[in-house]
Structure formats: structure tokens, C-alpha cells
């Protein structure tokens, strides 16, 4: 147990563990790890689809009672024990070593597909240095007499994404071939990650100033530009107008809790590793609150910037819809050009409907409502590589905005990769299983190369489908289980009193009633509720995916298919294999202790037998 004052044997003795150059490096590293692509492309979507401003109510409740308390535990225990995730849990109890191994496994799996998203971002970033942008027009067909039919049917941006970037197959069972342009981008991404993490926090601490701060500069630029675009106000009103009825839907509360959980990058082990390089007397309570609030405020800030541009896109699409209808009316009734303005269109259509009903009914008029176009948002890669990319096309100086947008996404993802790799590299180094004579730079290179080789499967034509599988199943359930084990391990095995003593020793202040109640009761209950909800959703909805199939009768809508049996087995393995470390290590430890006791008993019996014979 830590003492309230005086020397502590764990941390007061000078050791060789690296340390942050300054507090800002540490804060930026944690913020960079927490603030990732999900803040840009998932939170705005959830906020819009779950009642706008009403979604902020369950979101901030989850932040206060789930996110910040769990985050505080990770920072405090990492700083106190000065080890990575595996070392921390083995120190708390040898039976909990599987929690650290599970966190390590998930960090490894997530690193594989997260860096694949970065290779896509890099590909779009490199293609942004063209004018016009390559996704602004359809390519010519083989006869060069017209445009490619698939592009005309789906649209230029979707065609560039699905065909010219992914060259995706129409079924996951058809693996396809390696796409060499993506393979080269994967090489570049892993090389960049290696150069940044080559010396651990000594190297990432230098790069983090740029990778963590540059996205805020770009978001501010987009916000200023977006607010000056026509339709921006409508986009923001639509985003934040509260619909309190949505709070009656349990899915809203589940999505809010999971968004907080994954947005803070809890249970990956990266934050534990980062905190282990802190001075022992650092105020980790203040750090936890600051980083969590910055993460949430960034989500709100990004939502305003993103949806100001999305409002512009919706307004633009709405205007073009009206223009097509106006052109149809002008051609049908031989009206002079420009005789009908957008504002006059509703009244003109109403008049013609009343006087020329049959002729109007034969026209291919579309129903144009601004709200319908605002509804056409997306989350995940669909927002970044299709919806927002199309919006940028209509902005003056599209290439510049595209470079800024994908440059921002790359730095966001890169800073998150630092935390993922710390969750992989630090535990391996702390365990001492790697040869000590080999330089850290070489060991880091070997680990990055192993990750690179494992991620090559994502550069296949079916790689996009496999990335969705990894994103959906590799982390979700496992991290919830590990977070629950973290709370139980620290509060009930390490001990609440002992943990509070440690915090008092580190910060000079004992945790108050809020912290103790959330750690002991509220956070575990929320995590258990999320776990049960996930299990119910998995049972109710068989795993399926949406395939890009030009032969599908409703193309360009994607064809929904169920995963083949062997893929469903893979989904189950990804969902539960990392978690099996927990009972596996506990059982191995139990057998080891039983074996030792058995040997000790037999040795003692043998000695007594020899003594009796000697007598």
C-alpha cells in the first residue's frame, strides 16, 4: 500500500523507464489517442439520427458516470504501477494477467484495420493534388464513345471509391487480388508509423505536437468557411434541433454509452502505457477530466464544422433537384428560359397541376424537400470517402479543401495509431520476453513489420468487407469485458481503500464520494448493461453486409447479404478469442499453484519418510 508521505518503493527509486519531456507532450498524446476518426465521422451522425440536441443528454450522462471514471482508473493505475497493460494486471493479481493479454490482442487487431483506413485516406490525399479532382467526372468506356455505365448509374464519387479505389468484389467469398496501389499505400503508412514510434515516447512525443494540433487548425478553417456557405445554417439547425421523443428509444442510450466508451479509447491499454511514463506525483485526476472533456468538446466542434458543409451540400442538391423539375416544366409547356425561379416553382407547379393535370402527371418530376437531402448523411468511411468528398466537389477551390480534409484525417488517425502501438509494444517490452540485447528500434521494426504482413489481406478486392468485420467484431465485446474486469480488478481485488491511498499519495487528495460510487456501483452496472444489450443485438440480427454489386436490380443501392458460415465463425472468433485470455490465464495460474503445492507436499512427505527411515 502506498503511504501518504515519504518514500514509496515502487516509484521513488530512480529507474530506467522513459519519461515524458513535459506535461504537454503527455496530454497531447492522450488527446491524440482519444480524439480519432470516430469524432469526425460517427458522433455527428449519431447526434443527427438520434434526436439532434436531445442526444447530448444521454451522451453527457454516459460521459460523467461511465467515461471519466473508467478513464481515471486507467490513468491512475498506469501511473501508480509504472507498467504497461500486461504488467499492471499481473501486479494487481496473477489471475488477472489475461486482461492485459486481451487488451494487447485487441490493440494488435485494431492496429491492423485502423492503419488500413489510413491507407485509404492517404490514397485520397495523394489524388487531391489534381485539378479537377479525379472523382469529379466519370471515365470514358472502352470504346471512348461514352462514360462507363457503372459510374453513370452510381455517381462519380461512389464509383471512384468502390471501383477505382477498392475495386471491390460483389461478394465476400470472392477474395479477388491484391490492389497494388493500396499495397504501396499500406507500405507508406506502416513506414510512417514505424518512424514515429521507433523510440517510443521519445519519438512520438516530438511528432505529437503536429499530429494532435493540426486537426484543430483544419477544423477551424472548415468551420469558418462552412459557416459562410449557403445552407450552412439549415444544416446546423437540422443537426441540433432536439427531438426529445428519441430518448424513449433504448438504442439511443446504448449508442451514447458506446460512443463515449470507444471515443475515449478505453481498455485498449494505450492510456495505461502513456500514464506509466508520468512522474509518480502527477495529478492524474485533473488529467482524466481535462482529456475527457477535450475529447467530447472536439466531437461537438467537429459536428458543427462537418454539418455546416453538409448543409451546403444538401442545399446544393435541393437546388439542383428543383432546377431539373423546372427544366421539365419549361420544356413541356414551351415556357421562356429562366421564366420560373426556384422560389416561384411551388406556386407554378400548383397552378399547372390544377389546369394541366394530365400533362404534369406524365412528367418525371422528383419530390424535392431540403430535409430529405439533409437526411442523406452517413457514418464511418461512407461519410469521409463519399458524402463529404462529394460536398467538397461543389466548394470553390475543391482541391485545396480536399487536401486539407484528408490531411486532417491522416494526422488524426496517425496520432490514434501511436496509442494503439503503445498498447502493443509497451507490454511486450515490459514482459521481458524479447531478447534484451536487441535494440528497441529493431524490435519496434519487427513488430510493425508483423502488423504490416498481417494487414495485407485488407488490400485484396474483398478487403473492404473484411475491414467492416474487424471493425464490428474485433473490439466491441472484448473491450466492454476488459473494462468491466478493470473496474472489478482495481476496486474489488486491488482494493478500494488501497487504490484511494495510492491516489492520495500521487495527487495529495483522496477521491471523493462521486468517484467511489461510480467506481463501485454505477460504472460496472452501465458496462454490464451495455454488454447485455450487445449480446441481445447479436442474437436478434444475424451478421450481414452490404455488397457493391453492379448487377443488383436496385443498384446503386448496395445488396444486403448474409455472411457465409465460415465468415460467421470468423466473426464469433474475433468477438470472443481475445476475451478467452482472461479465464485461460486464471486457469493456468490456478493449475500452476496447485502443481507447486503438490510438489511441495510430496517433497515434504519425502523428507519425512527419509527422516523416519534414518531413525
From Swiss-Prot:
Result for mutant: residue 287 to N: No effect on protein abundance. Strong decreases of cell surface localization. Decreases alanine uptake activity
Molecular function per GO: neutral L-amino acid transmembrane transporter activity; neutral L-amino acid:sodium:chloride symporter activity
Main location: membrane
Keyword set includes Glycoprotein: yes
Inactivation phenotype: Animals lacking this protein exhibit no gross abnormalities and grow to adulthood, although they do exhibit hypertension. The elevated blood pressure appears to be attributable to a decreased level of renal glycine. High-affinity renal reabsorption of glycine is eliminated and intrarenal glycine concentration is reduced.
One CC-aspect GO term: plasma membrane
Effect of residue 25 to D: No effect on protein abundance. Almost complete loss of cell surface localization. Decreases alanine uptake activity
Result for mutant: residue 158 to D: No effect on protein abundance. No effect on cell surface localization. No effect on alanine uptake activity
Gene Ontology annotations of biological process type: amino acid transmembrane transport; neurotransmitter transport; neutral amino acid transport; renal amino acid absorption
SUPFAM superfamilies: SNF-like (SSF161070)
Keyword Cell membrane (UniProt): yes
Membrane topology value: Multi-pass membrane protein
Extracellular-side segments: 48-52, 127-177, 228-255, 310-397, 463-472, 542-570
Tissues with expression: Expressed predominantly in kidney.
Function summary: Symporter that transports one amino acid molecule together with two sodium and one chloride ions in kidneys and plays a role in the neutral amino acids reabsorption. Preferentially transports neutral amino acids such as L-glycine and L-alanine but also other neutral amino acids. Required CLTRN for cell surface expression and for its amino acid transporter activity. The transport mechanism is pH-independent.
Subunit structure: Interacts with CLTRN; this interaction regulates the trafficking of SLC6A18 to the cell membrane and its activity.
Family membership noted in the UniProt record: Belongs to the sodium:neurotransmitter symporter (SNF) (TC 2.A.22) family. SLC6A18 subfamily.
UniProt-listed PANTHER family: INACTIVE SODIUM-DEPENDENT NEUTRAL AMINO ACID TRANSPORTER B(0)AT3, SODIUM/CHLORIDE DEPENDENT TRANSPORTER
Name of the protein in question: Sodium-dependent neutral amino acid transporter B(0)AT3
Originating organism: Mus musculus (Mouse)
Amino acid at each position: 500500500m502506498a503511504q501518504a508521505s515519504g518514500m514509496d518503493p515502487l516509484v521513488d527509486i530512480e529507474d530506467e523507464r522513459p519519461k515524458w519531456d513535459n506535461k504537454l507532450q503527455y496530454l497531447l498524446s492522450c488527446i491524440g489517442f482519444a480524439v480519432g476518426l470516430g469524432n469526425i465521422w460517427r458522433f455527428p451522425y449519431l447526434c443527427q439520427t438520434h434526436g439532434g440536441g436531445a442526444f447530448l443528454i444521454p451522451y453527457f450522462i454516459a460521459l460523467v458516470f461511465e467515461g471519466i471514471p473508467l478513464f481515471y482508473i486507467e490513468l491512475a493505475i498506469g501511473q501508480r504501477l509504472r507498467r504497461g497493460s500486461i504488467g499492471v494486471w499481473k501486479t494487481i493479481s496473477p489471475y488477472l494477467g489475461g486482461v492485459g493479454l486481451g487488451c494487447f490482442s485487441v490493440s494488435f487487431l485494431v492496429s491492423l484495420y485502423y492503419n488500413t483506413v489510413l491507407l485509404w485516406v492517404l490514397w485520397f490525399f495523394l489524388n487531391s493534388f489534381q485539378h479537377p479532382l479525379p472523382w469529379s467526372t466519370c471515365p470514358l468506356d472502352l470504346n471512348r464513345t461514352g462514360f462507363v455505365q457503372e459510374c453513370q448509374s452510381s455517381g462519380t464519387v461512389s464509383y471512384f471509391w468502390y471501383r477505382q479505389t477498392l475495386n471491390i468484389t460483389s461478394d465476400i467469398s470472392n477474395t479477388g487480388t491484391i490492389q497494388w496501389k493500396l499495397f504501396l499505400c499500406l507500405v507508406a503508412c506502416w513506414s510512417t508509423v514505424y518512424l514515429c514510434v521507433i523510440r517510443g515516447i521519445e519519438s512520438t512525443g516530438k511528432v505529437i505536437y503536429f499530429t494532435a494540433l493540426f486537426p484543430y487548425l483544419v477544423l477551424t478553417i472548415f468551420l469558418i468557411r462552412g459557416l459562410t456557405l449557403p445552407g450552412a445554417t439549415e444544416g446546423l439547425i437540422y443537426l441540433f434541433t432536439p427531438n426529445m421523443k428519441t430518448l424513449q428509444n433504448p438504442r439511443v442510450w446504448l449508442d451514447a454509452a458506446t460512443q463515449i466508451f470507444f471515443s475515449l479509447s478505453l481498455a485498449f491499454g494505450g492510456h495505461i502505457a502513456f500514464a506509466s511514463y508520468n512522474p509518480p506525483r502527477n495529478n492524474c485526476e485533473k488529467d482524466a477530466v481535462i482529456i475527457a472533456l477535450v475529447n467530447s468538446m472536439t466531437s461537438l466542434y467537429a459536428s458543427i464544422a462537418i454539418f455546416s458543409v453538409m448543409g451546403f451540400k444538401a442545399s446544393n442538391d435541393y437546388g439542383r433537384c428543383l432546377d431539373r423539375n423546372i427544366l421539365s416544366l419549361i420544356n413541356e409547356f414551351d415556357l421562356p428560359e429562366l421564366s420560373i425561379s426556384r422560389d416561384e416553382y411551388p406556386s407554378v407547379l400548383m397552378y399547372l397541376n390544377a389546369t394541366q393535370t394530365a400533362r404534369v402527371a406524365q412528367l418525371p418530376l422528383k419530390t424535392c424537400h431540403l430535409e430529405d437531402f439533409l437526411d442523406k448523411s452517413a457514418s464511418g468511411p461512407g461519410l469521409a470517402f463519399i458524402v463529404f468528398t462529394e460536398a467538397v466537389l461543389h466548394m470553390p477551390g475543391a482541391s485545396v479543401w480536399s487536401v486539407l480534409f484528408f490531411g486532417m484525417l491522416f494526422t488524426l488517425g496517425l496520432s490514434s495509431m501511436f496509442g494503439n502501438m503503445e498498447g502493443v509494444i509497451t507490454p511486450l517490452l515490459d514482459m521481458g520476453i524479447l531478447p534484451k540485447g536487441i535494440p528497441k528500434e529493431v524490435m519496434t521494426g519487427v513488430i510493425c513489420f508483423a502488423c504490416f504482413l498481417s494487414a495485407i489481406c485488407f488490400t485484396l478486392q474483398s478487403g473492404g468487407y473484411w475491414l467492416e468485420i474487424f471493425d464490428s467484431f474485433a473490439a466491441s465485446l472484448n473491450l466492454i469485458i476488459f473494462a468491466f474486469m478493470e473496474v472489478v480488478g482495481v476496486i474489488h481485488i486491488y482494493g478500494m481503500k488501497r487504490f484511494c491511498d495510492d491516489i492520495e499519495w500521487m495527487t495529495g487528495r483522496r477521491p471523493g464520494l462521486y468517484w467511489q460510487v461510480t467506481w463501485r456501483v454505477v460504472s460496472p452496472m452501465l458496462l454490464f448493461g451495455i454488454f447485455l444489450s450487445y449480446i441481445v443485438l447479436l442474437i436478434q440480427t444475424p451478421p450481414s453486409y452490404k455488397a457493391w454489386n453492379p448487377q443488383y436490380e436496385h443498384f446503386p443501392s448496395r445488396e444486403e447479404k448474409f455472411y457465409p458460415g465460415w465468415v460467421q465463425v470468423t466473426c464469433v472468433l474475433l468477438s470472443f478469442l481475445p476475451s478467452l485470455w482472461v479465464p485461460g490465464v486464471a486457469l493456468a495460474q490456478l493449475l500452476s499453484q496447485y502443481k507447486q503445492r503438490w510438489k511441495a507436499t510430496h517433497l515434504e512427505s519425502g523428507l519425512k519418510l527419509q527422516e523416519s527411515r534414518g531413525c
